[in-house]
Amino acid sequence: MRSTKEKAELCRALHAGAEPTLSAACWDVGTAYLLAHVGVPLIDTTSFGAMATRGLPDAVGLATREFMLGNASEIAAAVDLPVQADLENGFGDSPEIVAQTILEAGTTGIVGGSIEDATGRPADPIYPLELAEERIRAAAEVARALPFPFMLTARADQYLWGRPDLAEVIRRAQAFETAGANAIMVPGLNDPVALKSVCDAVSLPVVVLIGAGPTNPPEIGCDRRKAHRRWRGHGSRGALGLCGHRPGSNRRARTRRLAGRHVRPRDHRHLPEPPRQFLTGKLATGRQY
């Protein structure tokens, strides 16, 4: 089993590679094992999936730091892969609370995590830019002091909360880069022209979230080294379709077509298989819900 530092270095290398990286999210140890089995190189946790195991909704402030870090710690200990955690909004409004979350995350075995600029309050869903930047700066300062290279992803959640302002997203992405983030994520943004604008506006890897929008992510005409894919949240159920065929093996599950999706016979859940582009690296797209 790799050490946390070795996993962290692998995570950084995957983000810096010449090809886009596909990661997928799991919600417990069992789903982590399945994703590791099919050759996914990088695993994320998901608050959507973790909360669903408790029969609770996501994105309304019910996920606690203790629960999400406990979930991530179990997953990180179970697989010999880098694991990044869904750290919600840092589990509090103030930069100090966000910093404490990163400090505690650094003891769990995970090698990275995402911090949202969403408050979790529908009436006032997005933090002001100045506060959002301060929160990322506080997180980055703690992350840099950890004994391994923690991958800090800053999220601009405007599109998820019905505020599709591309100019504001770009301002935030640039501010988060200045504040010390290592990657940018814009969940819900799937327009290829807009995504290219975000990629061109920052020097960091950009993450495209598969699942909060079209199933097949678009082509983006940006540097392939800057674009990474994540299949997360409820969309991660689709990634489990990979379990019918392990890349590199000669064994293939028989499939049939159902509503335009490949489905394994007798699979009552009808989990769709990911598009073949995910296995060939054809798409140049960016990344986790």
Residue ranges and their predicted role:
Residues 2-4, 232-283:
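Extended, intrinsically disordered, low-complexity segments
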Residues 2-14, 20-230, 236-244, 277-278:
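Alpha/beta enzyme core
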